[in-house]
Design a protein with these regions (language model features):
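Catalytic "switch" loops of ABC-type ATPases
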Residues: 14, 56-57
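Alpha-helical segments that scaffold the active site and NAD(P)H-binding pocket
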Residues: 10, 51-55
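Short, flexible catalytic-loop segment of classical short-chain dehydrogenase/reductase
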Residues: 9-20
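Rossmann-like NAD(H)/NADP(H) cofactor-binding core
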Residues: 1, 6, 64
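Residue-level preference for short helical/loop micro-motifs built around acidic side chains
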Residues: 19-20, 29, 44, 60
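A short C-terminal helix-loop "cap" of Rossmann-like NAD(P)-dependent dehydrogenase/epimerase domains
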Residues: 21-35
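A conserved structural motif in NAD(P)-dependent oxidoreductases
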Residues: 35-46, 57
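Short C-terminal tail/terminal secondary-structure segment
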Residues: 51, 62-77
Length: 77
């Protein structure tokens, strides 16, 4: 009882592992073609959704997946 199960589904965010790729022209073209917002996400853009799910503001949410992906999922439909 009282257990909530939610998730954040991040899109493309620059990390140490992928930064070399996203610095290339091919990587930049890929992001512009796949992400309607035309850019990579910034890590601090995950803060709001994370705080929502971790706080009482999200106390009536369960079974929810929050996409933080610049519209990538909707663009692929």
């Amino acid at each position: 009882n009282g257990i909530r199960v939610n998730a954040i589904a991040p899109g493309y965010f620059r990390t140490e592992m992928n930064s070399d790729y996203f610095d290339t022209e091919h990587g930049q073209t890929y992001v512009r073609s796949k992400v309607p917002m035309g850019r990579l996400g910034q890590l601090d853009e995950l803060d709001g959704p994370l705080l929502l799910l971790a706080s009482e503001a999200g106390s009536f949410m369960t079974g929810t997946i929050i996409n933080v992906d610049g519209g990538h999922v909707n663009n692929s439909l």
